[in-house]
A protein has these predicted regions:
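Amphipathic, small/basic residue-rich leader segments at the start of a protein or domain
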Residues: 1-128, 132, 148, 152
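Active-site-adjacent bridging/hinge elements
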Residues: 20-30, 84-93, 110-113, 192-195, ...
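Flexible, glycine/threonine-enriched loop-and-boundary segments that flank and lead into catalytic domains
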Residues: 71-90, 96-101, 165-189, 198-207
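FAD-binding glycine-rich core of flavoenzymes that anchor FAD
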Residues: 119-124, 140-164, 188-191
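N-terminal glycine-rich flavin-associated loop
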Residues: 129-147, 174
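A short core secondary-structure module
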Residues: 192-250
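A glycine-rich, basic-preceded beta-loop-alpha segment at the flavin cofactor/substrate interface
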Residues: 201, 240-256, 261, 271-308, ...
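Alpha-helical support elements that line or immediately flank enzyme active sites
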Residues: 313-324
Length: 337
């Protein structure tokens, strides 16, 4: 998708937000009235449009060739194209990435986030994956994590310095999530667990765009009930995070390889092995306790899953819309790539 092929139009979006949805009523609510006005959406969409047109769209060609490469090793196993680094930094500096996942004071209306994501996924479906999953991780931590966990992880997830993932699927546990075999063993430190297991098809599971990746991983503690009732959720960083927020040693999270998904070869969909050297640790999300073998990990993970389902639907709609733009221009140009 070359720069000249950026065909996106913003008129429909502005009509929907301003004239059809009546967002002015939403902005009168206490959560937004002291932070945003209708004019703000104009400036936000304008900046996002220019970033998509001038930075993301030209880099999309690299998403297919050369795409992301698996090079192996413990700490830096996946390499993305150089153009991705510029895109990632530009989006983070413009606060057009995971910052929208923040749901605390001063949060942005999610109906503003949808058109932002719509433009970005039209410009490059691969690249946008790197911060969409981070946004979901922020949502889960804000809703369920302890204050200490929020203070430790959310700030750098919001800035994109760290990435986030949804560690759900395993080789033998896809739709049947309750069959997860990953294990979490308590340590002498309350809330801290030693983890083992393999996760597959993990979107943005490893890459070189962020200095650390925070995996939200489903696992079962000893004596947990069978099925989804026994599942708990854990914060498992690629590099350990010290109490002061600094990075510690590699946390025994090994990238085994990446998939080549149709249409998003630049996206790093990874297979991850936790605890191969028996040195992988994580924190149970929140003040949760496993009582009578029951965990609340699935409840927590559904906040993540439901958000990503909406994002996936938006991706599909976006690609359909962008293709319709391409076809409408085809009689006048044969340079659409």
């Amino acid at each position: 998708m070359a720069h000249s092929n950026w065909l996106y139009q913003t008129r429909d979006i502005m009509f929907q937000i301003k004239e059809w949805l009546g967002v002015d009523k939403l902005l009168s609510l206490d959560a937004y009235k002291d932070y945003y006005g209708m004019d703000d959406i104009n400036s936000i969409l304008d900046v996002n449009y220019k970033v998509c047109r001038d930075v993301m769209c030209p880099a999309n060609k690299d998403a297919d060739e050369p795409g992301a490469k698996f090079v192996g090793g413990n700490e830096h196993a996946v390499v993305t194209p150089d153009s991705f680094k510029n895109v990632y930094k530009t989006v983070m500096d413009a606060e057009l990435g995971p910052q929208f996942g923040y749901r605390g004071e001063g949060k942005i209306p999610l109906c503003w986030y949808a058109p932002i994501l719509e433009m970005q996924s039209a410009a490059s479906p691969s690249i946008v994956m790197f911060w969409c999953l981070t946004q979901g991780a922020i949502t889960v931590l804000h809703e369920f994590a302890t204050q200490k966990q929020q203070d430790l992880f959310i700030p750098k997830l919001r800035t994109g310095e760290w990435g986030g993932t949804m560690g759900l699927t395993e080789p033998g546990a896809g739709s049947e999530v309750g069959a997860v075999q990953s294990k979490a063993f308590p340590t002498d430190t309350p809330g801290k667990y030693k983890l083992t297991g393999t996760k597959c098809f993990i979107s943005s599971g490893d890459h070189d765009l962020a200095e650390n990746i925070i995996h939200l991983m489903l696992a079962k503690t000893p004596g947990a009930k069978e099925g989804t009732a026994g599942i708990s959720l854990f914060i498992v960083p690629k590099f350990w995070v010290n109490d002061d927020g600094s990075l510690g040693a590699w946390n025994d999270v090994t990238t085994m390889g990446i998939e080549h998904k149709l249409g998003i070869h630049g996206s790093t969909t990874a297979t991850l092995s936790m605890g191969e050297n028996e040195n992988c640790y994580g924190w149970m999300v929140g003040e949760a306790e496993v009582k009578d073998g029951r965990g609340i990990g699935m409840k927590q993970m559904f906040a993540y899953m439901n958000e990503e389902r909406l994002n996936t639907g938006l991706f599909s709609l976006t690609l359909h819309f962008f293709l319709s733009c391409c076809f409408s221009c085809f009689p006048n140009s044969h340079n659409i790539q």
